Amino acid sequence: MRTKAIAAAAILLIWSVLASVTAAGPSQTHHKPSRDEATKAIRASAYEMMKAFLTSDVETFKRHSAKRTLELVSLVFEAARQDPRYQQELQNARITNADQFLGYFLQGMATQYLQAIPLSPEAAARRVANDSAVSFITDSEAKVIAGDSEVARARLVARVWKIDMTDSLKKAVLKEVNDPELRARIKSL
């Protein structure tokens, strides 16, 4: 089932991105936030996104995701829906839209993760988040780094930091998508 392979690869990459950022309180001030305040806000957003992943909370996950990441999820759903190899699986799971598609695979991957690590979603999100770094590119964009690798970008959109995992996910997704038009749309994100 290549749909599961696509989703599993995407979700594993999502998890690695989200698992690398710590929790902190968001900054909602009107002045230009300091880098420390921005770092705290980025980590807060990523923590909430990780917790949403572990609890299969699609709405919260989406709220903290960058638009590009959500567009990628929609394109992956479209690719799976159009591919005859995946249509039965989507039908059996009663998946009719990108949100259900995202929720279905978040739930499966979160269940596996939480079975392997016997912690609450909150504790797991905090635990795996302690080894990340935030490196600013500009005042409105930063790299989220785990170990020696960039795993995501954080982008400031309307004074809220959104986590953009698109570039980290595209390579794995493109390996599984065969439709030339969808491949081109994914590459253009």
Question: What does each of the following model-derived ranges do?
Answer:
Residues 87-121:
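Low-complexity, serine/threonine/proline-enriched polar segments
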Residues 1-10:
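Bacterial N-terminal signal peptides that target proteins for export
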Residues 126-189:
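Low-complexity, intrinsically disordered terminal/linker segments enriched in charged
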